[in-house]
């Protein structure tokens, strides 16, 4: 099932959300850098999951419902770009 792609500025579901603050320097979705597995979120968190079939710079791209190291899922992503 395809899920919305996560970009810099998108966030997780924790009560105080963590935002993606780093991403690809040359792969963009809706004009924003794509957030990939291992990219940074606020407060020292990182994206711990990513696509196993779609990559940016050799790293799995983040999608809505992937997990951040705080233990919560990403809930905000692109409204027009999706990946498996």
Can you name each region flagged by the protein language model?
Residues 1-84:
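Intrinsically disordered, low-complexity proline/glycine-rich segments
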């Amino acid at each position: 099932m395809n899920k919305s792609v996560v970009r810099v500025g998108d966030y997780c579901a924790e009560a105080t959300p963590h935002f993606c603050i780093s991403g690809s320097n040359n792969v963009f979705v809706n004009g924003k850098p794509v957030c990939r597995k291992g990219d940074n979120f606020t407060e020292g968190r990182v994206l711990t999951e990513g696509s196993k079939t779609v990559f940016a710079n050799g790293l799995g791209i983040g999608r809505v419902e992937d997990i951040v190291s705080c233990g919560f899922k990403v809930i905000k992503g692109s409204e027009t770009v999706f990946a498996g």
